[in-house]
Amino acid sequence: DEYVGLKMKRPFVEKGTPFDLDVIGVDLDGKSVPGVPIEVKASRLDFEYKHGHYKETRVDPQTCAVTAAADPVPCRFATDKGGEYEVVATIVDAKGRANQTKLTFWVSGGDTPPSRDVKQERVQLIPDKKEYAGGETAELLVQAPFYPAEGLVTWRRSGIVKTERISLTSATTTVKVPVTDGMVPNIAVQVDIVGMAART
């Protein structure tokens, strides 16, 4: 009857920047369970081409072994390569029953498997925060379905507020922009890219 919780400080980091998260063990009532061991594993998600299809694999495993405490306990993972990482935390109660929690985070500079079809593909945007106020700097991770590519970032609120041209030499890049009072609330961001994509 014990559960493990994970909280990340931000959903992505630059390649080479350690990824930090907090780990906590609780019971059914949400109360902390100090002294219980928790194992946290992180793996990078990679894609292996076999029999005409790309298959997701987990590589470069890292382990952070902690002991639950009254307050959240920190874990840190290296990010030597870009891409998507999966974190799995496991806690085992006194009866030997395991409970797991999973989350994913992104590291700039990773690749995605190419598509077999020629179609309009989506650019994925991941903000570093859910909300921004005037005076802050917004940071967006741009995940492109192909590269190299040229892109245009457009910020809209009752018309176009700002545009920025970007060049992608990898599948991900980071865009930073200072948030002014005129951009809030409810600003929209759009990224359009053009380039070439490999086909299998």
Which residues make up each language-model segment?
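A structural signal for beta-strand and strand-to-loop patches characteristic of beta-rich domains
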Residues: D1-T200
